[in-house]
Amino acid sequence: GDEYKVLASYGHIRDLPSKNGSVDPDQDFKMQWEVDSFSKKYLKEITDAAKDSSKIILATDPDREGEAIAWHVKEYLNEKKLLKDKEIERVVFNEITKKAVIHGIQNPRQIEPLLVDAYMARRALDYLVGFNISPILWTKLPGSKSAGRVQSVALKLITEREHQIESFKPE
């Protein structure tokens, strides 16, 4: 209805800078976030709307990444001191139909910390594995791009299998 203003973040609004130390394993994996340059325009729209709102509904995707986006938006607004005396709700729906949206709005919940933790663990691993393995990969295989937590393990499995095939001696 007219009492709602719908704004998009267009995905994640913050990320880990690609410098060393963005994830600190010695400090309980503390992460240093920075606002994504693409997101600055959309964050301004969100913060401007939040200033004039009594209630903020975070309706990102109903998965780990969506939960993280909702958490980042809430944290960002909190850092800007825009949440005082405001009601914050997390709304999820699995389809974009009038019935599903109304049901979601009528059944709000809080941000799910376990989903946010799952995102944090995934992001920390992506950062730590990629940040530490990619430079080694670049020196050994010039022209290669990067190494991630999933592709590195998959590559290891493939090379182990290739070694088994090469060393196979038929009886």
Question: Where are the regions that the model predicts?
Answer:
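Intrinsically disordered, low-complexity regulatory segments
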Residues: 1-120
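C-terminal or mid-to-C-terminal helical accessory/interaction module adjacent to the motor/catalytic core
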Residues: 51, 96-171
